[in-house]
């Protein structure tokens, strides 16, 4: 039977090493299955997630207790299904790749990318807090950094940039709040959370904007 461990402790050197290898594998998968659109969106989110792991290791920050974090994580994760529904019914899988000069994703590819990701995110959280395999904080952090914070920033930016609704915009607004709450609980620092928001915006917004203009 799986039992939540209340005290997870800090990241160790091996956790960081394995997380780095995982980041390379995840990045390769994203580029393979999603091509340029995921290369300019998911990869920066992955790099920032890995940077937070190095930050936590350098500062020897203890991971939050299962009681304080796991229910919050899955409550916020439930919102992702609502967000996915909005993206699906409004044609995000068609509009998103077109921004970068790529062909629209098939329904099968779009659903596969999301369902595999959701499986990894949820299992990662469960395993971290039951088996203490702390290197699996990487997929958890990636969901928080890109799936929450990234969605809030990019969907808002695309709607502003195009002066109109962009698929997924409405439900993405919830992630401004959820992303801040979940990451600040995980890092135990509001300052680090705000800097993550700012850092993501400074890196990703120019990248996606210039890439879109180039292919326009």
PLM ranges: what are they?
Residues 100-113:
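Short aromatic-rich membrane-water interface segments that cap or initiate transmembrane helices
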Residues 40-42, 100-101, 160-174:
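Non-cytosolic membrane-interface motifs at loop->transmembrane helix junctions
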Residues 45-57, 116-124, 173-185:
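Hydrophobic cores of alpha-helical transmembrane segments in multi-pass inner/ER membrane proteins
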Residues 32-39, 156-166, 214-216:
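Membrane-interface helix caps and helix-loop-helix hairpins in membrane proteins
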């Amino acid at each position: 039977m799986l039992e939540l461990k209340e005290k997870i402790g800090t990241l160790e050197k091996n956790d960081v090493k394995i997380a780095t290898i995982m980041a390379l594998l995840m990045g390769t998968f994203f580029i393979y299955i999603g091509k340029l659109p995921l290369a300019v969106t998911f990869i920066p989110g992955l790099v920032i997630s890995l940077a937070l792991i190095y930050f936590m290791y350098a500062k020897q920050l203890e991971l939050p207790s299962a009681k304080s974090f796991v229910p919050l994580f899955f409550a916020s994760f439930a919102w992702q299904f609502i967000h996915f529904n909005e993206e699906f019914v409004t044609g995000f899988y068609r509009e998103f790749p077109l921004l970068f000069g790529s062909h629209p994703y098939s329904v099968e590819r779009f659903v596969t990318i999301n369902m595999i990701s959701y499986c990894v995110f949820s299992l990662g959280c469960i395993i971290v807090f039951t088996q203490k395999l702390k290197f699996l904080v990487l997929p958890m952090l990636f969901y928080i950094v890109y799936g929450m914070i990234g969605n809030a920033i990019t969907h808002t930016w695309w709607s502003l940039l195009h002066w109109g609704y962009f698929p997924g915009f409405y439900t993405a607004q919830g992630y401004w709040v959820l992303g801040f709450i979940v990451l600040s609980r995980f890092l135990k620092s509001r300052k680090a959370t705000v800097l993550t928001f700012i850092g993501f915006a400074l890196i990703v917004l120019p990248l996606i904007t210039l890439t879109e203009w180039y292919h326009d």
